[in-house]
């Protein structure tokens, strides 16, 4: 008796076909990225993150990192990291709820709540391994089908992904458009409302209208979640963040900060009313279902907070502010469009992917690492160089950047001057006019297939000749 395979198996592709199909699809996708100038390439640092580094075997000045205060290689933080590893070992051994929550984590959470929680009467902090995980937690644990999220159009990808996972209704308002946001809030009857915004927007460097956001949240009974990834440690008195810089307090606030940028280590945190944090401990999947970060990391962050809040932190912020103002001036010397940013993120919008990559390579030839930011990170047609400043930079570094940017800018001007005007680029090559005229004369002749026919009566002899040739 012949056995027939189950119908579910009969439809399976031949062995290996699924792998081949997937690889073909991915290879086509990679080729498309190459054709559009959109493939991203990793570079390998051979030394610690600093203004002057060795990358891919070359000495460079880096304008790519988010190490805004230049603390990533600070001796006090390196020593604290080593001390934490000696005390707690190299790993946490489990999730925060199953054995991985150490004294270093608990101490850091208390310190963070005291340092950046001045906006709340009852602040509590929750430490996460990454900023991405912190934003996912805030979006998913605090919302659901009953909620509406009102999101700035330029919010970070981690917030957007969290919104998608939350199952909440998401309404996007134009970037920093408070009138549009107010209209959306007026029309909403959602049980829970969350307004969500970056504080410093990572690709433009501008700062959200935080006072207006707080006022709208309070007026409409909404919560305001702010992601201060690029403000914590840099903005406000003692680097306490964007809310402290604007002197804002509200019971409606939820504050997210990261610890791998200005703080120079790794991780992130959420600060909110203690009830909000307790709920996140119970329900935030990106907190519950992952191994806790090594305690040594938390121990190093505690050392970082001391530097940030002290006299050295003030001096580093003052130097960074001076670098920012100098950079704003030098970017205006190029042919390109600088964004009006007063933060350490200084974008220079060039436009096309090809021109942006050419500018990046020109700077790289001078030993300067300034990354090209392209779609989908930024809208099509707004590809840019993003100059990220650090207190570890010197004014000599900026002088090198200025000279290289001017040369790159002039190089693009020369390349464009060497190209014919767009109206002429579609004209046929030299000599083609003759060909066109010939084509017109040819058009007046019978088709070539008819012109080559033999004289009447020659068909038989032609056929015979072909047969002889074939033989």
Swiss-Prot record:
Root EC class: transferase
Keyword Transferase carried by entry: yes
Residues the entry annotates as binding pyridoxal 5'-phosphate: 131-132, 202, 230, 258
Pfam family, one: Aminotran_1_2
Names of the cofactor(s): pyridoxal 5'-phosphate
EC number: 2.3.1.47
Keyword Glycosyltransferase in annotation: no
GO biological process: biotin biosynthetic process
NCBIfam families xrefs: bioF
PANTHER family cross-referenced by the UniProt entry: 8-AMINO-7-OXONONANOATE SYNTHASE, CLASS II AMINOTRANSFERASE/8-AMINO-7-OXONONANOATE SYNTHASE
Quaternary assembly: Homodimer.
Name of the molecule in the record: 8-amino-7-oxononanoate synthase
Organism whose genome encodes this protein: Burkholderia ambifaria (strain ATCC BAA-244 / DSM 16087 / CCUG 44356 / LMG 19182 / AMMD) (Burkholderia cepacia (strain AMMD))
The gene coding this protein: bioF
């Amino acid at each position: 008796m012949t056995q027939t395979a189950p119908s579910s198996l009969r439809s399976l592709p031949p062995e290996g076909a699924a792998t081949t199909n997937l690889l073909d699809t991915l290879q086509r996708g990679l080729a498309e990225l190459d054709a559009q100038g959109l493939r991203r390439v990793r570079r390998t640092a051979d030394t610690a993150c600093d203004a002057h580094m060795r990358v891919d075997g070359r000495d460079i000045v880096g304008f790519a990192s988010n190490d805004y205060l230049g603390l990533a290689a600070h001796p006090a933080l390196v020593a604290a990291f080593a001390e934490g590893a000696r005390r707690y070992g190299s790993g946490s051994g489990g999730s925060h709820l199953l054995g991985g929550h150490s004294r270093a984590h608990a101490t850091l959470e208390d310190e963070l709540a005291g340092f950046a929680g001045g906006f709340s009467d009852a602040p509590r902090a929750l430490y996460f391994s990454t900023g991405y995980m912190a934003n996912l937690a805030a979006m998913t644990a605090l919302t659901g089908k009953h909620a509406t999220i009102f999101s700035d159009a330029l919010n970070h990808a981690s917030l957007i992904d969290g919104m998608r996972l939350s199952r909440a209704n998401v309404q996007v308002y134009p970037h920093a458009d408070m009138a549009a946001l107010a209209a959306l809030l007026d029309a909403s009857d959602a049980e829970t409302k969350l307004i969500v915004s970056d504080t410093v927007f990572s690709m433009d460097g501008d700062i959200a209208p935080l006072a207006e956001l707080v006022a709208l949240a309070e007026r409409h009974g909404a919560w305001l979640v702010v992601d201060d990834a690029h403000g914590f440690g840099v903005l406000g008195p003692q680097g306490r963040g964007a809310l402290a810089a604007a002197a804002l307090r509200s019971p409606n606030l939820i504050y997210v900060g990261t610890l791998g940028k200005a703080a120079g280590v790794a991780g992130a945190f959420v600060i909110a009313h203690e009830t909000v944090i307790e709920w996140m401990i119970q329900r935030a999947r990106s907190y519950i279902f992952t191994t806790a970060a090594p305690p040594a990391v938390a121990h190093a962050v505690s050392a970082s907070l001391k530097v940030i809040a002290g006299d050295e932190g003030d001096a580093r912020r003052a130097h960074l502010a001076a670098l920012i103002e100098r950079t704003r001036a030098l970017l205006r010397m190029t042919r390109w469009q600088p964004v009006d940013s007063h933060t350490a993120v200084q974008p220079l919008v060039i436009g096309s992917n090809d021109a942006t990559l050419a500018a990046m390579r020109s700077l790289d030839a001078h030993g300067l690492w300034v990354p090209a930011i392209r779609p989908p990170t930024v809208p099509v047609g707004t590809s840019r160089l993003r100059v990220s400043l650090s207190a570890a930079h010197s004014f000599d570094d900026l002088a090198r950047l200025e000279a290289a940017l001017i040369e790159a800018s002039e190089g693009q001007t020369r390349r464009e001057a060497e190209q014919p005007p767009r109206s002429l680029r579609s004209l046929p090559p030299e000599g083609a006019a003759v060909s066109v005229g010939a084509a017109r004369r040819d058009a007046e002749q019978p088709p070539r297939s008819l012109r080559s026919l033999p004289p009447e009566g020659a068909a038989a002899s032609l056929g015979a000749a072909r047969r002889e040739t074939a033989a």
